[in-house]
Swiss-Prot record:
Residues where Phosphoserine is found: S122
Protein name, UniProt field: THAP domain-containing protein 3
Keywords, ordered alphabetically: DNA-binding, Metal-binding, Phosphoprotein, Zinc, Zinc-finger
GO biological process entries: positive regulation of transcription by RNA polymerase II
Segments for region (Disordered): 84-177
Zinc finger (THAP-type) boundaries: 1-82
InterPro entries: THAP3, THAP_Znf
GO MF, one annotated term: zinc ion binding
Species of origin: Homo sapiens
Signal peptide start and end residues: none
Tissue spec. comment: Highly expressed in heart, skeletal muscle and placenta. Weaker expression in brain, kidney and liver.
SMART domains: DM3, THAP
Description of how the protein assembles with itself and partners: Component of a THAP1/THAP3-HCFC1-OGT complex that contains at least, either THAP1 or THAP3, HCFC1 and OGT. Interacts directly with OGT and HCFC1 (via its HBM).
Length: 239
């Protein structure tokens, strides 16, 4: 069954001509990491299967481990390199609560500010200039004071991308859900390979010792059989 990349706008397929291109399955054993993979791919209502893969071109170089003969992803690797990183091309459901609060506060400002500037002759004047020049009634000033503190939050929410790029995390961060989490996996891999190599040497030595013991036991049995034969032949020769 040919392998093809599941990322949006990616047509890479498995081919023996491109040996440097590798394909990696989704981390179903880690639900939080799997959710980030699915969000970054940028496909609406996408549900990966057990054999769904993504090619290595969507990962940064630091996402791969330096040990082993083939490309292995680190335990916290997340695909972040895509061709649709333009926010106008990103399609996903608006589930960011910060963006919803930003949209609500911006709509509230649009409702309050026209009421404050209703008595002005030029309604198309700049918003900041109108706020400085107008002498607002007490109730209107109260509305503006309630709305103005939310302006930084609304600006931050509008400036924040609502696509999958806003939910990405840098691959350098190490997830530490527990205080006893293993962080230095490279050194542990190196120790594991050294231990396996030493174990192989000891296994070969054990096989050699067993072979020597078998030879010695066979010689001992042959020697005992020869002595028994001589003991039986001795009385017959004397008679």
């Amino acid at each position: 069954m040919p392998k093809s990349c599941a990322a949006r706008q990616c047509c890479n397929r498995y081919s023996s001509r491109r040996k440097q291109l590798t394909f990696h399955r989704f981390p179903f054993s880690r639900p939080e990491l799997l959710k980030e993979w699915v969000l970054n791919i940028g496909r609406g209502n996408f549900k990966p299967k057990q054999h769904t893969v993504i090619c290595s071109e969507h990962f940064r170089p630091e996402c791969f481990s330096a040990f082993g003969n083939r490309k292995n992803l680190k335990h916290n690797a997340v695909p972040t390199v895509f061709a649709f990183q333009d926010p106008t091309q990103q399609v996903r459901e608006n589930t960011d609560p910060a963006s919803e609060r930003g949209n609500a506060s911006s709509s509230q400002k649009e409702k309050v500010l026209p009421e404050a500037g209703a008595g002005e002759d030029s309604p198309g004047r700049n918003m900041d200039t109108a706020l400085e020049e107008l002498q607002l009634p007490p109730n209107a000033e109260g509305h503006v004071k309630q709305v103005s503190p939310r302006r930084p939050q609304a600006t931050e929410a509008v400036g924040r991308p609502t696509g999958p790029a806003g939910l990405r995390r840098t691959p350098n961060k190490q997830p530490s859900d527990h205080s006893y989490a293993l962080l230095d996996l490279d050194s542990l891999k190196k120790k594991l390979f050294l231990t396996l190599k030493e174990n192989e040497k000891l296994r070969k030595r054990l096989q050699a010792q067993r072979l020597v013991m078998r030879r010695m036991s066979s010689r001992l049995r042959a020697c005992k059989g020869h002595q028994g034969l001589q003991a039986r032949l001795g009385p017959e020769q004397q008679s």
